[in-house]
From Swiss-Prot:
The keyword Protein transport is annotated on this UniProt entry: no
Family, similarity comment: Belongs to the tRNA nucleotidyltransferase/poly(A) polymerase family. Bacterial CCA-adding enzyme type 3 subfamily.
Source species of the chain: Bacillus cereus (strain ATCC 10987 / NRS 248)
UniProt-listed NCBIfam families: PRK13299.1
GO biological process: RNA repair; tRNA 3'-terminal CCA addition
CDD domains xref list: NT_ClassII-CCAase
The encoding gene: cca
Protein name as catalogued: CCA-adding enzyme
Amino acids binding Mg(2+): 39, 41
Binding site for CTP: 26, 29, 110, 153, 156, 159, 162
């Protein structure tokens, strides 16, 4: 409750001014579950302009949605006016938002009962939709009619399965049936929003359970490039996903599991940044090389430690090995390399030009590469004079 106490002065101040105010959302849910608390959000009957008038230190980030960031005790908190939402457009956003003075009206528009619990500053729960019961049963249940909730915002179906992965809960029967019925509506949702949820699914503690739900509800068939992947997705549930430390590894392993032959094309379809695509593809390519042979100095040097560590964890998952020392071994091998990158070489193109008395040309870059590999393999010491002598001995000058 420590973090809530830091923010409780906001609620107390709002109440002193005649308004209602409560802690709401994921932070309350995680407090009940005893999980680490993320952002703490506050809902209030005060209108945005009233919130801004009460708290001089504020940032008006989303006034059209009723949200003001209030800075209290050096921490930012989202304070949002109670609201209801009208008819939804395109199965993803309300056509308009109405501010209301009723907590119940605000909570009933939320997605799942576990996320529709409010809490007073004293820690008393206001649970109008049996959210605590759902948490106790470890069930994901929609607020009200599941069909209505998913037709309002189809992304809620992905969120539901993402919560399976992060919390280990199960989809309540009617909620699961509604996902099977309305899964096609996910095709109206921007792929960027789906990608965010899917990445949280892949990196969750209970990823395997969530992937099974993705198959059982047939929701996977409405995702880009996954329409024909039922058997491969089931294959992915047979592996241990616990060893990954980054989302890059999780995506690389997922692409391996589904047998994706054109990973860059797949990832572009899912709207990844070029940098992320490059890293994921690099991990996959390195894993392929790793399957053919163990690490050697040249492979490790060319790969770099960042990609090598991730590739080793993916490789270990692929071969279903639980040798937690393998990444440590890669780190030790890398630290023993004579140089870690080309910038550490004690020779330059100018040195070669001076020694050879030849005109500049492609031969300089080729020679630098030969020297680089020789240093990495331990064939020559990384000292200027030693390199010159080695070149002469090899008749390369």
């Amino acid at each position: 409750m420590k973090r809530f106490k830091k923010a409780s002065s906001i609620i107390e101040t709002l109440k002193q001014q005649g308004h209602e105010a409560y802690f709401v959302g994921g932070s309350v849910r995680d407090l009940i579950i005893d999980r680490p608390i993320g952002d703490i959000d506050i809902a209030t009957s005060a209108l945005p302009e009233e919130v801004m008038a009460i708290f001089p230190r504020h940032v008006p980030v989303g006034l059209e949605h009723g949200t003001v960031i209030v800075v209290e005790n050096g921490e930012p908190y989202e304070v949002t006016t109670f609201r209801t939402e009208s008819e939804y457009e395109d199965f993803r956003r309300p056509s308009s938002v109405q501010f209301v003075r009723s907590l119940e009206e605000d909570l009933k528009r939320r997605d799942f009962t576990m996320n529709a619990i409010a809490m007073t500053e004293e820690g008393e729960m206001v649970d109008l939709f049996a959210g605590q019961e759902a948490i106790q049963k470890r069930e994901i249940v929609t607020v009200g009619n599941a069909a209505d909730r998913f037709q309002e915002d189809a992304l809620r179906m992905m969120r539901g399965i993402r919560f399976v992965s992060t919390l280990g809960f199960s989809l309540e029967t009617k909620t699961k049936q509604a996902i099977e019925t309305y899964g096609h509506l996910l095709e109206h949702i921007a792929i960027e929003r789906i990608t965010v949820e899917f990445e949280k699914l892949l990196t969750g503690t209970y990823c395997v359970k969530a992937l099974k739900e993705l198959v059982e509800t047939k929701l996977f068939s409405h995702l880009p490039y996954l329409q024909m992947s039922e058997e491969r997705l089931l294959k992915a549930t047979q592996y241990n996903w616990d060893s990954f430390e980054t989302d890059i590894e999780a995506w690389a392993f997922f692409l391996y599991c589904i047998g994706e032959e054109h990973p860059a094309v797949f990832l572009r379809q899912w709207k990844f940044s070029n940098k992320k695509i490059k890293d994921i593809v690099a991990v996959l390519l390195t894993v392929r090389k790793r399957k053919e042979k163990d690490w050697d100095t040249v492979l490790l040097y060319k790969t770099g430690i960042h990609i090598a560590e991730m590739a080793e964890r993916v490789y270990e998952a692929m071969i279903e090995s639980y040798d937690h020392t393998s990444v440590k071994r890669v780190q030790t091998l890398f630290q023993a390399l004579p140089i870690k990158n080309r910038q550490e070489m004690n020779v330059t193109g100018n040195d070669l030009l001076n020694w050879a008395s030849k005109k500049p040309g492609p031969w300089v870059a080729e020679m630098i590469q030969k020297i680089e590999e020789a240093i990495v393999q331990g064939n020559v010491v990384n000292e200027k004079e030693c390199i010159r002598e080695w070149l002469q001995e090899c008749n390369l000058l």
